[in-house]
Regions:
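Polyanion-binding surface elements
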Residues: 139, 257-258
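N-terminal targeting/anchoring "stem" of glycan-biosynthesis enzymes
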Residues: 15-17, 313-316, 320
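Non-catalytic accessory segments flanking enzymatic or RNA/DNA-binding domains
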Residues: 1-167, 174, 188-250, 263, ...
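Conserved catalytic/binding loops enriched for acidic/polar residues
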Residues: 293-296, 300
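Protruding loop/beta-arch "assembly-hinge" segments enriched in small, turn-prone residues
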Residues: 206-216, 321-347
Length: 347
């Protein structure tokens, strides 16, 4: 978790001519001791409406707090950092932000301790858990089971929407295909095989920490979804990426459910992060806690190829081993709704 502190702000816009205040609220952050008033100036530039800072608060781990607020209000999110909030909803959102900030303050010493432990190599010791750790683990397993159920439902909704949008670029306001733009890269394996001495002269070793935390949790339930008779293509039809289907009530309801689930997923992930921090602190320098978690932190030596130096020294060879990977395609369900939902209010 990024513990960098900052300020969370809530902004509205006011029309200079009519004095009307927008129904939309921007929830954003500032870092590096910048005030919300100074950030307000960034948004004011070129904006014909007056920016008003309604509320703000200071918190550690400000990026985590902002992410939580955006996800928990996904059902109210219109686009980007803008949310459709009534005065009552805005008040509730600010109270939630205060609650989450206090939660971060409470757990900050433990989170800072985790950062310290993460920077040290683990021993071969395995700790025997006491009753407190066993209780924490039970809470973790309950959280993990619900989180997996939410993730599985989100995956199912995504697959249903993708099936609905087959042979098109997506569904207006709800989902679309995202096409990557791969950068050219050097085929190092082929270069090493063909020119081992040249490759070796631009390769160095660097030492880093290899770390992975895993905790024992329930197995994910097996899905019983039947496989279709004909598999859908993994990639979208490239000649129809600009063609979008119109929404209907069914897909809007699915999208609304998706947004509500995002809020719950975020809440559960928030809880999981703090539970895992407790486990890591309890683990300390040891590599594991018997039956609960494993957190080995080992020294790893990796090879690093100096691509820039190689290209400058051998431009012709570099060109012959440079290629551009094929683009990848991802079907993305919007985490906001730029249209009027029949259902409203944060869940």
């Amino acid at each position: 978790m990024n513990l960098t502190p900052g300020s969370l702000y809530f902004m509205r816009e006011r029309d200079h001519v009519t004095g009307d205040i927008s129904a939309y609220v921007k929830i954003g952050l500032t870092r590096d001791d910048r005030t919300s008033e100074s950030r307000k100036g960034d948004h004011q530039t070129g904006n014909p409406r007056e920016i008003i800072v309604i509320e703000e608060l200071v918190s550690p781990a400000i990026s985590e707090l902002e992410t939580q607020m955006h996800a928990r209000h996904a059902i109210d999110r219109i686009t980007g950092e803008w949310f459709a909030l009534s005065e009552t909803q805005l008040s509730d959102a600010y109270l939630l932000a205060q609650k989450l900030a206090k939660n971060l303050e409470k757990h900050l010493p433990g989170l800072q301790r985790v950062e310290q432990i993460a920077a040290t190599l683990s021993t071969e010791e395995e700790i025997k858990p006491d009753s407190t750790l066993l209780d924490i683990h039970e809470v973790y397993k309950t959280n993990a089971a619900e989180l997996m159920a939410v993730e599985d439902e989100l995956k199912g909704i995504k697959e249903t929407l993708r099936d609905f949008a087959k042979n098109t670029g997506g569904i207006n306001g709800i989902a679309s295909w995202r096409v990557s733009a791969p950068r050219p890269k050097i085929d190092e394996k082929r270069l090493q095989a063909d020119h081992p001495k040249i490759h070796s002269s631009f390769t160095s070793s660097e030492t880093s920490m290899a770390s992975r935390f895993t905790a024992t949790k329930p197995r994910r339930a097996k899905t019983t979804k039947e496989k279709p008779e004909t598999d859908e293509p993994a990639n979208p039809p490239l000649d129809r990426l600009d063609f979008f289907l119109d929404r209907d009530q069914t897909v809007e309801q699915l999208h609304a459910r998706h947004l509500i689930l995002l809020a719950r997923q975020s809440e559960l992930t928030w809880e999981k992060d703090f539970i895992e921090a407790q486990m890591k602190v309890a683990c300390g320098n040891a590599k594991s806690i018997a039956g609960i978690c494993s957190w080995p932190r080992l020294e790893a030596i990796k090879s690093k190829f100096d691509k820039r130096g190689f290209t400058a020294a051998h431009p012709d060879i570099s060109d012959s081993y440079t290629f551009t990977p094929a683009p990848t395609y991802s079907f993305i369900v919007n985490e906001f709704h730029p249209y009027a939902l029949k259902i409203g209010g944060t869940k």
